[in-house]
């Protein structure tokens, strides 16, 4: 059995987990998240803990038990604490402004780039060169952060562009005569 799948999830106070035939719902202060149930994984709830077991002895069911367990754990953490990603803008004149769930980027193009945030995702700019994306759904937070980064990814010679705050850019050496 999967090492991750063996570990139970402790359900904190204030979080309601409901297991139905076709989906698992997690409700908390951060909102409600749903996950489609996989027929290869059995979900058992007892004494404030969730256990995940493969429905049969196949390798696929074993792997899926760990995957589903981690997805549900991310849902529980998301509705209690939430997830956040930080992005930095590096470059002369690069700046960002957030207002009304919209992000306005000026990153060296002839026009500003506007990005609408989906429901459940909030964006803030602490400084004009720092973007903070927050939300309960880990996948959506990461996806929006990747889409923002893709507007102007860091280039390898000067490092200009939009990067994750913990990302290290390896700077290439320029061609010498």
UniProtKB/Swiss-Prot annotation:
One of its GO terms (biological process) is cytoplasmic translation. GO terms for cellular component: cytosolic large ribosomal subunit. Signal peptide: none annotated. It comes from the Bacteria. InterPro entries: Ribosomal_uL6-like, Ribosomal_uL6-like_a/b-dom_sf, Ribosomal_uL6_a/b-dom, Ribosomal_uL6_bac-type, Ribosomal_uL6_CS. GO terms for molecular function: rRNA binding; structural constituent of ribosome. Keywords: Ribonucleoprotein, Ribosomal protein, RNA-binding, rRNA-binding. Disulfide bonds: none annotated. PROSITE patterns: RIBOSOMAL_L6_1. Belongs to the universal ribosomal protein uL6 family. NCBIfam families: L6_bact. This protein binds to the 23S rRNA, and is important in its secondary structure. It is located near the subunit interface in the base of the L7/L12 stalk, and near the tRNA binding site of the peptidyltransferase center. Part of the 50S ribosomal subunit. This is Large ribosomal subunit protein uL6. It comes from Variovorax paradoxus (strain S110).
């Amino acid at each position: 059995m999967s090492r991750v799948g063996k570990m139970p999830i402790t359900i904190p106070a204030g979080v309601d987990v409901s297991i139905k035939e076709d989906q698992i719902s997690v409700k908390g202060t951060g909102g409600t998240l749903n996950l489609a149930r996989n027929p290869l994984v059995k979900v058992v709830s007892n004494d404030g803990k969730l256990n995940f077991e493969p429905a049969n002895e196949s390798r696929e069911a074993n792997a899926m038990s760990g995957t589903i367990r981690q997805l549900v754990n991310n849902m529980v953490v998301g509705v209690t604490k939430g997830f956040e990603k930080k992005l930095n803008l590096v470059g002369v004149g690069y700046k960002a402004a957030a207002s009304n769930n919209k992000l306005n980027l000026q990153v060296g193009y002839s026009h500003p780039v506007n990005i609408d945030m989906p429901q459940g995702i909030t964006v803030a700019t602490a400084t004009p060169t720092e973007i903070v994306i927050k939300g309960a759904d880990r996948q959506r937070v990461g996806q929006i952060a990747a889409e923002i980064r893709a507007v102007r990814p860091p280039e390898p010679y000067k490092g200009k562009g939009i990067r994750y705050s913990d990302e290290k850019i390896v700077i290439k050496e320029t061609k010498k005569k």
